[in-house]
């Protein structure tokens, strides 16, 4: 019978595409890794790995086995977690992913509140690209994440929490910044800055530019909301910044001017995400509820 250990070794090889690096990742020798994978192939009666390729490639059936192995290993980890936490309540470490366009402006207070309410739990927060973190979540490298929608992925529970308003800001010396009320046609042809194209924010700004008849400045991609604000303040273009960032101590409007635009109601939907059937579902729901409550309080809107 194929063992969980052999499946772990196969997944490691799929991730690293190199026998030595995969062996190091699972703390065994390279010969042991090769021997165990050959034993797995013999047991299944198929070839899983094309060994003459560099980097190592999986056969078509190998890719299918890896996909199933990832799910098996995640399910086993959830069962082990459930057993370890039986009767323990909220405790342990939760690996939490969040987009950098949200985490720094919302999570600090939530983490502190969570630790006060549940002293035996630790929220390990890591920033990343939402679509990439969704894949990490699916394979068990993350336990929970906070992300703008839409989000792609299978076997994920998506819990919408709140809508965050988005605002157009301009260089303070630009002519439209002097107007008490800005019309959409005033922004036709204007250049808009955005995050790099891996972020939801890039796609949303692109769609808004299309709606306004504005131009997305492909040559200027920010790595953070701070960099967007600074580039905008320097006169490089307009930007679209979320409400929580503008309300935060690290953000604000000291370098830019928020525009009062007629007929403007752009926003983004924020959701908590975890694996369907995860052992800690009740804990994740508690954290999601705390995030929703905190966000609604900051934004000054009632819970639905």
What are these regions (language model features)?
Residues 7, 43-44, 65-87, 287:
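Alpha-helical linker/hinge and terminal dimerization helices associated
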Residues 154-160, 164, 179-180, 226-276:
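Beta-alpha-beta core module
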Residues 41-63:
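A short LG(V/I)-centered, amphipathic sequence patch enriched
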Residues 106, 257-299:
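A late-sequence structural motif
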Residues 11-32:
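Short helix-boundary/capping micro-motifs
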Residues 91-154, 222:
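Central regulatory/effector-binding core of bacterial HTH transcription factors
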Residues 176-177, 191-212, 280-289, 295-304:
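Secondary-structure junction motif
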Residues 153-192, 197:
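Flexible hinge/capping segments at coil-to-helix
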């Amino acid at each position: 019978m194929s063992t969980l250990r052999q499946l772990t070794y196969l997944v490691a090889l799929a991730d690293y595409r190199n026998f030595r690096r995969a062996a190091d990742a699972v703390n065994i020798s390279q010969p042991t890794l090769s021997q165990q994978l050959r034993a797995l192939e013999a047991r299944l009666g198929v070839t899983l790995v094309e060994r003459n390729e560099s980097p190592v490639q999986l056969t078509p059936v190998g890719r299918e086995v890896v996909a199933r192995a990832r799910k098996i290993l995640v399910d086993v980890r959830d069962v082990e977690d459930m057993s370890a936490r039986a009767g323990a309540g909220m405790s342990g470490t939760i690996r939490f992913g969040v987009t950098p366009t949200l985490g720094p402006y919302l999570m600090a207070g939530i983490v502190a509140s969570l630790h006060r309410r549940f002293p035996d739990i630790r929220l390990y927060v890591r920033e990343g690209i939402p679509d990439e973190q969704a894949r990490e979540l699916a394979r068990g490298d993350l336990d929970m994440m906070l992300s703008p929608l839409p989000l792609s992925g299978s076997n994920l529970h998506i819990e919408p929490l709140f809508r965050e308003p988005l605002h157009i800001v301009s260089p303070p010396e630009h002519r439209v910044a002097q107007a008490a009320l800005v019309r959409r046609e005033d922004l036709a042809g204007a250049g808009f800055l955005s995050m790099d194209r891996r972020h939801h924010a890039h796609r949303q700004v692109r769609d808004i530019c299309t709606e306004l008849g504005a131009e997305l400045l492909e040559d200027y991609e920010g790595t953070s909301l701070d960099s967007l604000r600074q580039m905008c303040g320097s006169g490089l273009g307009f930007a679209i910044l979320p409400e929580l960032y503008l309300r935060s101590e690290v953000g604000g409007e000291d370098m830019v001017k928020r525009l009062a635009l007629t007929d403007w109601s752009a926003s983004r939907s924020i959701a908590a995400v975890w694996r369907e059937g995860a052992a800690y579902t009740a804990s994740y729901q508690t954290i999601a509820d705390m995030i929703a409550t905190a966000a609604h309080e900051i934004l000054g809107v009632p819970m639905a």
